[in-house]
């Protein structure tokens, strides 16, 4: 089963001319929208597919209004499996120019067959009827233990997604665990670690935070959400290393995420 979210992330001034043609450029996979760059096109069951892109050449009216729609299609082996067309999306081109950073977001079901998928996104600019498309392939791995739905927010309630970080700010790293085993009491036994490595390859703390989950998990829960707090106390480039160990099955899974923090101005 698929669910989809599409929309506009922000407005920027880039191209001064409006030619009547549009294009979709700079497609990128992210951990959330906005989110940190995702370096792999391999996904797991229960994960979220986030594709961001720039729609260039859109035409605004005298008040700076831009109207467009997005069609998202998911195909496997050349066969259309899922299709979603958004309602008209209206944006205000407050800064001028003719580029709209947009996105499509797909929630991958736990029962989705593994294999190779193709996502095609088509943007239609309503005023000129111009269209442009982008295609992104991804691989859905076999169902197993993993860390999914990674996203960064500036608040604990997960209402403020962010991918730009400055010193003095708070960062909440949100994620879910999938594919874990349960004991005779129907409870998991998981150990999740978040280790941060600096640009010199050294851990930032001697004892990284660890979450241990072994009780009070509802029997029907297949996706186990949790979050880690990160205090952005200095600038630099870091790697966040997440690891989950299932102490019942003996399996483990890990993910490395790049993190860059700038000095506050």
Positions of PLM-derived features:
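Bacterial N-terminal signal peptides
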Residues: 2-13
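Intrinsically disordered, low-complexity terminal regions enriched in Ser/Thr/Pro/Gly
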Residues: 18-265
């Amino acid at each position: 089963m698929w669910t989809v979210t599409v929309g506009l992330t922000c407005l920027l001034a880039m191209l001064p001319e409006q030619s009547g043609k549009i294009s979709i450029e700079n497609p990128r996979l992210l951990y959330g929208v906005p989110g940190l760059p995702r370096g792999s096109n391999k996904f797991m069951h229960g994960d979220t597919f986030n594709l961001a892109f720039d729609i260039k050449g859109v035409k605004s009216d005298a008040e700076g209004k831009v109207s467009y729609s997005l069609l998202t299609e998911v195909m496997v082996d050349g066969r259309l499996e899922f299709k979603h067309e958004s309602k008209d999306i209206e944006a205000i081109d407050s800064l001028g120019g003719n580029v709209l950073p947009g996105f499509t977001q797909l929630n991958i079901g736990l029962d989705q067959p593994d294999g190779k998928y193709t996502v095609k996104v088509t943007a239609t600019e309503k005023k000129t009827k111009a269209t442009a498309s982008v295609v992104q392939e991804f691989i859905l791995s076999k169902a197993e233990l993993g860390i999914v739905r990674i996203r960064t927010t500036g608040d604990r309630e997960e209402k403020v997604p962010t991918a730009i970080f400055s010193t003095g700010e708070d960062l909440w790293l949100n994620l879910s665990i999938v594919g874990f085993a349960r004991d005779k009491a129907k409870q998991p036994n998981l150990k999740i670690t978040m280790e941060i490595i600096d640009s010199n390859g050294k851990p930032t703390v001697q004892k990284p935070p660890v979450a241990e989950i072994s009780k009070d998990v509802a029997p029907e829960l297949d996706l186990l959400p949790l979050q880690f707090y990160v205090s952005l106390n200095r600038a630099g480039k870091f790697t966040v290393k997440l690891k989950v160990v299932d102490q019942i099955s003996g399996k483990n899974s890990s993910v490395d995420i790049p993190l860059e923090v700038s000095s506050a101005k």
